[in-house]
């Protein structure tokens, strides 16, 4: 396995100062909990407070777990296990690239899958669960909108006797005051 240091890229430039401080602390052996505990002044969750240097150390030190006894072991090509390839991880707003072997990459992905299943965060179930009741909600919303629209159209004001087209029309009867109309009506 290669002894190359992992590369971390911050494409948005949000953590440039924090990354410099993390690198300085990692080289000196100090901790950088204060610089990685907030992003632009916002407090983050306890899981997100894990520093990138700590994540690198955990991944580099962890070996692949033993394969399950019931699963068939895939045939490996000679020399394939020794070759390391770059693996990119997106975590806490940063991108980290590690040179890991194929076995270690599979172990990391298997561990992430098991953690996701244990917490019930399956991608398909969340999407189906959220949108299962949407057509009924849409129907109720549409019915509410149509009933309010009907009420607005049927409850035209007393000065819109001729309908919506008569609102813009100006005649001699519409420009007179209320008292003048009343006098005309009683005189007739």
Swiss-Prot record:
Ubiquitinated. Targeted for degradation by the SCF(COI1) E3 ubiquitin ligase-proteasome pathway during jasmonate signaling. Residues 28-38 have a biased composition (Low complexity). GO terms for cellular component: nucleus. Coiled coil: none annotated. Residues 179-188 have a biased composition (Basic and acidic residues). InterPro entries: CCT_CS, TIFY/JAZ, Tify_dom. Keywords: Jasmonic acid signaling pathway, Transcription, Transcription regulation, Ubl conjugation. Residues 80-114 form the Tify domain. Pfam families: Jas_motif (PF09425), tify (PF06200). A motif (Jas) lies at residues 135-160. GO terms for biological process: regulation of defense response; regulation of jasmonic acid mediated signaling pathway; response to wounding. Induction: By jasmonate, wounding, and cold, drought and salt stresses. Down-regulated by abscisic acid (ABA). Signal peptide: none annotated. Transmembrane segments: none annotated. Residues 20-41, 156-188 are annotated as: Disordered. Belongs to the TIFY/JAZ family. Repressor of jasmonate responses. PANTHER family: PROTEIN TIFY 4A-RELATED-RELATED, PROTEIN TIFY 9. Interacts with COI1A and COI2 in a coronatine-dependent manner. Coronatine is an analog of jasmonoyl isoleucine (JA-Ile). The jas domain (135-160) is required for interaction with COI1. This is Protein TIFY 9. It comes from Oryza sativa subsp. japonica.
